[in-house]
Curated annotation (Swiss-Prot):
Catalytic activity: S-sulfanyl-L-cysteinyl-[protein] + uridine(34) in tRNA + AH2 + ATP = 2-thiouridine(34) in tRNA + L-cysteinyl-[protein] + A + AMP + diphosphate + H(+)
Cellular localization per UniProt: Cytoplasm
Alphabetized InterPro entries for the sequence: MnmA-like, MnmA-like_C, MnmA-like_central, MnmA-like_central_sf, Rossmann-like_a/b/a_fold
NCBIfam families (alphabetical): PRK00143.1, trmU
Pfam families registered for this protein in UniProt: tRNA_Me_trans (PF03054), tRNA_Me_trans_C (PF20258), tRNA_Me_trans_M (PF20259)
Site (Interaction with tRNA): H139, Q352
Protein name: tRNA-specific 2-thiouridylase MnmA
Binding site for ATP: A20, M21, S22, G23, G24, V25, D26, S27, L46, G138
Keyword Isomerase in record: no
Entry GO MF terms: ATP binding; tRNA binding; tRNA-uridine 2-sulfurtransferase activity
Amino acid sequence: MSLNSLDLPGKSEDTRVVVAMSGGVDSSVVAGILKREGYDVVGVTLQLYDHGAAVHRAGSCCAGQDIEDARRVSESLGIPHYVLDYEARFREAVIDPFANSYVSGETPIPCVSCNQTVKFADLLQTARDLGADALATGHYIRSRANGAHRALYRPVDTDRDQSYFLFATTQEQIDYLRFPLGHLPKAQVREIAEELGLTVAKKQDSQDICFVPQGKYSDIISRLKPEAANPGDIVHIDGRTLGRHDGIVHYTVGQRRGIGVATGEALYVVHLDAANARVIVGPREALETHKVFLRDVNWLGDTPIADLPKSGMEVFAKVRSTRPPRPAVLRHADGQTWVELVDGESGIAPGQACVLYSDDSNAARVFGGGFIGRSEREPQAEEMLRRLMANADKASAA
């Protein structure tokens, strides 16, 4: 049997596709393209959080005006549209873990958790329940057949590359998902929106974390976890106490501005000692990292990760969403997975992701990745930090 444009067997008119519609231009264009190609399209929008503060806020997502925009687009395209209340699930799977992660001294990525649980688990099951053959989204990433399964690849428009946030997508999910925008540049997507007469053609892209009004994540975390605003010491990596802070929630590893102490030297946040409510600062050199240890690894390579050679596997790694993939070596032994960064990186924060690729081109395959559990700095800085943490543990035990 021949395959249609979504690599599914059969004619497009016999293929039902659920489109995850956020109310933005990207997912709206996906619905429009698939409808134009003759697919049986069903739009689904998730209400993920209390939209009171976001009803009229530009750059929000999945609340208030966005839901109305998705409804209007669906109506104009002549497709059924459903709004599902996932607010409780979103709080449980995304917002609470986000706050817990910050309290523990990490810098989490809620978009990964949202994709991993709410969008690509719960919504995917909803799509199956609706009898859909696939779930399509407006993410900028590509997938194509790889043997009996499908594999992920970076998009044509690398400025919009969302693969960093999709590393945790499982093989089962990848096989069911479709990403029609992966081969299109953003400018062309907006042109298509104009051609289709979509009311969201000029709508601003979503910004920051969707459930955080004005990007002030510290307000939400402090409300959910008041202990995150507990004051504590600002300590130099060499052991000197330099001042006080108003809660580790206001800091992240690599931060330079707004630290709250003036010593005449450039200082950066090197580590967040959540157990002792301390912000550890130091010179830029103390941020240099060549090795990161991963947890919750989602490996999408063809060879099982446990079967990697002792010499490791040459890959390219991204430790920030805004950075291009850089040369690295992936290793796995004794149940641990780590990545050695050939050129090093600065300011790597626990809780962030390390995503792995075959190369650094826009055709690179995504091999998955993991969350950064810890990193190793340059030997001198690593020893100073270990000594500082050990002394704190002794003081706490005394």
